[in-house]
Curated annotation (Swiss-Prot):
The gene is hisS. The keyword Oxidoreductase does not apply. Its main location: cytoplasm. It is found in: Cytoplasm. Belongs to the class-II aminoacyl-tRNA synthetase family. This is Histidine--tRNA ligase. GO terms for biological process: histidyl-tRNA aminoacylation. Gene3D superfamilies: Anticodon-binding domain (3.40.50.800), Bira Bifunctional Protein, Domain 2 (3.30.930.10).
Length: 427
């Protein structure tokens, strides 16, 4: 027997029982996005490597350790990367196709991303993100509306009581530069207390030290200078405006001054929705403002704000805290059973007639042999509520036997009345 080939570690198959849950959650989220005026954008999963180096930052963990990068074939031999996130791709597409200059755009995307990480529950090497990006608006009101949108998601999924909003402002580029100097000076005074990861980041990306998961580092940081003390007036006013809007609509939040996010393009507002229901993988949705990224990637200066949510982690959370959120496991509403030498072609023709009249009906026809009991067993297995029975007698008479599998009642109807009868029985 030939050796079996398995999926790559950290890259998962999603089988029909899984995808039904995915589809139900995706449809819920997409409907809410449409209600806020968002349109879908689809970008390639492979981009030129410099896009992510310039957007995310050369000294971030994503660029240094986690990207899947390879050299393309051909004479050009360009460096390409499987996308680790899609904000950069959206910005690249917006600039390339002229969507952003002097325009307001509200875009959403859904698709696979790739990062080389240690696989664990809720963290995979291929994972899926649903994200939303808004271009052309710079006030705190759009930041607030994006957060309101996500809060509406949580209510629709039945998880609102299990997520907490954390907020921070990381200010302008100039404010962060001043704070960076103060933070590095503090870290230099305590370098003997830093772990190796923080020592590595101390000069290359010191704000990420604030994000350390090491409890001893977090204790040390209690005495560190605070970013809020270095905020410029505009950033402080923006953040105060955002908090006031969230207070007005009743969205509770916690200001977390150590929340900095792992990507270099953020400025001013950053936020995360976190949960304690998934162990160490606590962040389910995160985002913020990135007003300088469009210019940085070659476009005109354009304010922007957005977020992304990991679908795998969200699905784990929904399944953990809201068992009533169940996807429909039935694949058929109606099952067409047929008997007799000439019944197969007649059954296929009848099925197509029904689909023409009732295009949203889920109809399965029996294929292969099987007596009456066996075919009704297949109907039940597929979750059908109605069985249509077509034999030689029904074919000759131009009728169909309709059996309600819930009540057991069976009636004979003409083919011309069949669609109306099915509509009546299925509500």
């Amino acid at each position: 027997m030939a050796q079996k080939i398995q999926a790559i570690r950290g890259m998962n198959d999603y089988l029909p029982a899984d995808t039904r849950v995915w589809q139900k959650i995706e449809n819920t989220l997409k409907q809410i996005l449409a209600g806020y005026g968002f349109s879908e954008i689809r970008t390639p999963i492979v981009e030129h490597t410099p896009l992510f180096q310039r957007a995310i930052g050369e000294v971030t963990d994503v660029v240094e350790k986690e990207m899947y990068t390879f050299t393309d074939r051909g004479e050009d031999a360009q460096s390409l990367t499987l996308r680790p996130e899609n904000t950069a791709g959206c910005v690249r597409a917006g600039i390339e196709h002229g969507l952003l200059y002097n325009q307001e755009q509200r875009l959403w995307y859904l698709g696979p991303m790739f990062r080389y990480e240690r696989p664990q529950k809720g963290r995979y090497r291929q994972f899926h993100q649903l994200g939303a990006e808004v271009f052309g608006l710079q006030g705190p009101d759009i930041d607030a509306e994006l957060i309101m949108l996500t809060a509406r998601w949580w209510k629709a999924l039945g998880i609102a009581e299990h997520v907490t909003l954390e907020l921070n402002s990381i200010g302008s580029l100039e404010a962060r530069a001043k704070y960076r100097e103060a933070l590095v000076a503090f870290l230099e005074q305590h370098v003997d207390q830093l772990d190796e990861d923080c020592k590595r980041r101390m000069y290359s990306n010191p704000l990420r030290v604030l994000d350390s998961k090491n409890p001893e580092i977090q204790t040390l940081l209690n005495d560190a200078p605070e970013l809020f003390d270095y905020l410029d007036d505009e950033s402080r006013e923006h953040f105060d405006g955002l908090c006031a809007l969230l207070d007005a609509v009743g969205i509770t939040y916690r200001v977390n001054q150590r929340l900095v996010r792992g990507l270099d393009y953020y400025n001013r507002t950053v936020f995360e929705w976190v949960t304690s229901a998934l162990g160490s993988q606590g962040t389910v949705c995160a985002g913020g403002r990135y007003d300088g990224l469009v210019k940085q990637l070659g476009g005109h200066p354009t304010p922007a704000v957005g977020f992304a949510m990991g679908m795998e982690r969200m699905i784990l959370l929904v399944q953990a805290v809201n068992p009533e959120f169940v996807a429909d496991t039935h694949v058929a509403d109606v099952y067409l059973a047929s008997f007799g030498d000439n019944s197969q072609s007649a059954a296929l023709m009848l099925a197509e007639e029904i689909r023409d009249q009732l295009p949203t009906l889920r109809l399965m026809t029996n294929h292969g042999k099987g007596n009456f009991k066996k075919q009704l067993g297949r109907a039940d297995k597929h979750g059908a509520k109605i069985a249509l029975i077509l034999g030689e007698d029904e074919i000759n008479a131009g009728t169909v036997a309709v059996k309600d599998l819930r009540s057991g009642e069976q009636t004979i109807v003409s083919r011309s009345e069949l669609a109306q009868q099915l509509t009546l029985l299925l509500g």
